[in-house]
Amino acid sequence: IPHEELTTEFIKRGIPAEKLVPTGIPVSERFLKLPEKREARGQLGIPADKSCILMMTGSMGYGRVESMTAKLVEQTGEDTHLYILGGTNEELKKTLRDTYADTERVHVLDFTTEAHLYMAAADILFTKPGGLTSTEAVAAKVALVHTKPIPGCEDRNVAFFTQHGMSVSGDTEDAVIQNGLKLLRDPEAQAEMRKCQEKYGKPYAADAVCEFICGQKEAAQEEA
């Protein structure tokens, strides 16, 4: 399971405690071996002297991306660049590119396998509160802003992350944007969030899973 503090919730849903192992969610080791921000920006061609907002929409390009992009552009200046990972949603990407064809600070990107580098390069990340992407963001230690969740498990993700200082969010789209921009402009708040991510995150979950499985195998062999 993602974290030991969630053990009681799983037990209440009928799963025996002895079946629960709080390893965290495994992520690619690419998120654990990231370059420094300046180096990542150099690799991606992102200006070193600009603020960088990263927006991830998921591989299918879901979310209120057009509305949020418009508000972020309106409420930031020329010193802030916005990078949108548009996934495979060609219609969304075309709409955004047409809308912002006259500005050099909105960058609409195709599906990429370099999300880890963009996280390393970004000052803050706006993303839907899916479990895997959120865990990757914590592993990358990027200041995290959760957008509107899908009712259900994503609601719980937002609650857990915000309660533990690992992200900010809001009840409305405007509140999400305001809280995100406040975080962007507050390096001390970003640093504090990274401390919380380091404290509560489990970036080495894959190792923990392997160790548990190997331990179970060894125990079974000893009993045989």
Segment roles from a protein language model:
Residues 6-10, 92-96, 133, 152-158:
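Short, glycine/polar-rich helix-capping loops at beta-to-alpha or helix-loop-helix junctions
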Residues 122-123, 141-143:
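A short alpha->beta transition loop at the rim of the catalytic pocket in nucleotide-sugar-dependent
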Residues 1-59, 88-91:
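A nucleotide-sugar donor-handling region in carbohydrate enzymes
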